[in-house]
């Protein structure tokens, strides 16, 4: 199964993904994490953050997800997933695909800003920031939408039903 976590920077994708992967593995379900930032590093940081490069990175992650799923390995991705066509490709090509959109108000993202992206953008130091000068098209067909404007504890409670879905997909 491929669990596809979608959201802007700071939405909690990696936090939720890490919890799902840890707990699924503890329950004996081999599950791997594909994090958009880590995939960039693995491939030698050969891509920038332009739309074209972001699309190439998304294609890599889609293909890796399918490759691992075809071998019976559960996959949890943490990715911006800017492109509706990538999500559609996943639905059409990955047999056990489950899309999760982590919806977080922009004000909360700016407050969290663990990578400093929004601050740098607002100071004019960087560009190509999804949700700011790069349009983020919200998913319209997500299997579940999680509102992450509440506490971290409340947010992480969403891991359990996702793990159950992953376990029962086998």
Please place each PLM-identified region on the residue numbering:
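Loop/turn-to-beta-strand initiation segments
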Residues: 30, 70-78, 98
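Conserved substrate/cofactor phosphate-moiety recognition/catalytic segment
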Residues: 17-63
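Walker A (P-loop) ATP-phosphate-binding motif of ABC ATPase nucleotide-binding domains
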Residues: 2
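Small-molecule kinase domains that catalyze NTP-dependent phosphoryl transfer to phosphate-bearing small molecules
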Residues: 103, 111-170
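The conserved Walker
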Residues: 9
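Conserved lysine of the Walker
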Residues: 13
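Hydrophobic anchor at the beta1->P-loop junction of P-loop NTPases
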Residues: 5
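Conserved phosphate-donor/acceptor-positioning beta-strand/loop module used by diverse small-molecule
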Residues: 77-79, 90-112, 146
């Amino acid at each position: 199964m491929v669990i596809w976590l979608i959201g802007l920077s700071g939405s909690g994708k990696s936090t939720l993904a890490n919890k799902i992967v840890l707990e699924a593995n503890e329950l004996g379900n081999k599950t791997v994490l594909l994090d958009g930032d880590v995939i960039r590093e693995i491939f030698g940081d050969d891509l920038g953050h332009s739309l074209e490069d972001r699309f190439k990175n998304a294609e890599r992650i889609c293909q890796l997800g399918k490759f691992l799923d075809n071998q019976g390995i559960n996959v949890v991705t943490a990715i911006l997933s800017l492109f509706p066509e990538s999500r559609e490709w996943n639905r059409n090509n990955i047999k056990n695909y489950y899309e999760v959109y982590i919806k977080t108000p922009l004000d909360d993202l700016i407050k969290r800003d663990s990578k400093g992206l929004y601050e740098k953008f607002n100071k004019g130091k960087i560009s190509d920031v999804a949700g700011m000068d790069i349009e983020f098209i919200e998913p319209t067909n997500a299997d579940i939408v999680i509102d992450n404007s509440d506490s971290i504890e409340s947010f992480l409670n969403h891991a359990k039903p996702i793990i159950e879905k992953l376990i029962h997909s086998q």
